[in-house]
A protein has these predicted regions:
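Short, structured helix-loop boundary elements
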Residues: 16, 20, 38, 87, ...
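Juxtamembrane extracytoplasmic/periplasmic/luminal helical "stalk" adjacent to the first N-terminal
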Residues: 2-79, 99-103, 142
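Short, conserved clusters of charged catalytic residues that mark active-site
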Residues: 25, 36, 89-92, 128
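Residue-level detector of solvent-exposed, low-hydrophobicity positions
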Residues: 9-12, 36, 57, 85, ...
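Second-shell loop/turn segments in exported
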Residues: 78-85, 120-123
Length: 167
């Protein structure tokens, strides 16, 4: 009986050690993947097509004074697509990006936080009141906590990178 208990305890300790090692390896690999994704977002945020799109989008928003309207009014104006109506050139410009790098969803806003383009239907038309958007704008990036995406039963981590126009 003592021998069986000792063997069981040793097996349990070995299993726990293997699990800890796998968790460490997973954490290292996830960190590297997040760094790679952040690097892609940083490069994409400096891409000439992205800069031009956000420049023109901001110009259109400001010319029409959309950035001065209350958020609920903007949401009402753009409730169907939740995107600022923009010229057809925007999606074709962004197709020039080398790849979406495995991101299931990308959202591009102009400098006032109004959506210009989204690869999936966004929940709302204005992002400037969202903590993640403000954090990315002020700190230079934002990485959210892992969450379960119930639509595909996968864990997702949201990331944001501001587009800073050098002009």
């Amino acid at each position: 009986v003592w021998s069986g208990i000792t063997t069981y305890q040793r097996t349990l300790q070995q299993a726990e050690l293997r699990l800890k090692n796998q968790a460490r390896l997973t954490a290292v690999l996830m960190h590297k993947e997040l760094e790679r994704k952040a690097s892609f977002l940083s490069i994409a945020a400096r891409d000439s097509a992205v800069l031009e799109a956000t420049r023109k989008g901001s110009q259109m928003v400001e010319t029409n004074q959309l950035h001065t309207l209350p958020i609920d009014r903007v949401e009402t104006l753009f409730q169907q697509k939740r995107l600022v109506p923009f010229t057809s050139m925007l999606p074709s410009q962004l197709e020039k990006l080398p790849s979406l790098d495995g991101f299931p969803d990308l959202l591009l806003t102009e400098r006032n936080g109004l959506n210009l383009l989204s690869s999936a239907p966004p929940n709302d038309a204005v992002q400037r009141d969202e903590a993640w958007w403000e954090t990315a704008r002020t700190r230079g990036e934002w990485v959210g906590s892992p969450q379960l995406d119930v639509s595909n039963n996968r864990v997702m981590i949201e990331m944001a990178q501001p587009v800073i126009d050098p002009e």
